[in-house]
Amino acid sequence: MRKRTRMDLCCALGAALVAAFVMTWATLTGAKAQTAETLQSLDDAWWTGPLVSYSARSLPQGHILIEPYFYDVSANRTDSIHSFTYFLYGATDRLTVGIAPDIAFTSAHGGADSSGVHLGDTTLRAQYMLTAMDPARGIPDLALAVLQNLPTGKYDRLGRTSDGFGGGSYATTLAIYSQMAWWMPSGRLLRTRFNLAETISPRVPVSDASVYGTDAGFLGHAQPGNRFSVNTAFEYSLTRNWVLALDLIYNHGSATTARGFHAAKSVHIESGDSDAFGFAPALEYNWTANFGALAGVRVFPAGHNTNASVTPALAINYVH
């Protein structure tokens, strides 16, 4: 009998969470319609948010959000363990700004591990809420966001390829987020999100071994491909404290190229376009309206020019 791997266990966990979500969906859609008096109130539902999608709701002015994520990307015979933390601040009731640094370590099966824990790239973000959700009038939360990548992670001149945790690019992401709450026939709330994002990356100077597949002695540049993503999410409020969540994800990446010279010879490396579809079931638990935890797994089957990956994740969400 084949030994069960971590990826097998994570896939089994993801399948179990998806099955729980589907069974709950079937139950709630088959329930009898409730009267207005028995509908769950918006204040009675506490949320941390799903695993992948961003919230369109801004923080109230003067409030802060701290949300550390801990996750392990298991793909292509490597495990990359990350700690990624959001620090967000409500500059006004409609404008939220923040920063999200990343630290990581890679364990390579059959290869060299990272030389230690390293800093990855850092993201600056600003988000402006255009409308505030009003379910009675059919108005969703709607926001525009700008994310700026700071290339704080090492990406070239690598002694070990497992030390590459950055991209070297000042990439800019433009996004639109929406969020809405719906009352299901069971009377419980279902919150949905829909995100669209486009990432544009400028050219990057590259020397020696790098995350772009170049070797020691290379001198040239890389052009990361632009990325487009679509994400929709569903959260069902089981009780005030417990929430089932599910993200559905599509990512498209344009070809990434590296051009330059190695040992006086011209070098051209191209990855080709890529497409990936994934899902991320999760379970939320909220101790209060401002403090909760989230556990789940993000699964990407192998796609067009993409490897299969399984990423178990845990997050703590605190608003003050």
Residues covered by each model-derived region:
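Residues on the lipid-exposed face of transmembrane beta-strands in outer-membrane beta-barrel proteins
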Residues: 66, 85-89, 124-128, 146, ...
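Short loop/turn motifs that connect adjacent beta-strands in outer-membrane beta-barrel proteins
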Residues: 54-62, 77, 94, 132-141, ...
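Outer-membrane beta-barrel biogenesis signature
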Residues: 28-68, 73-74, 134-141
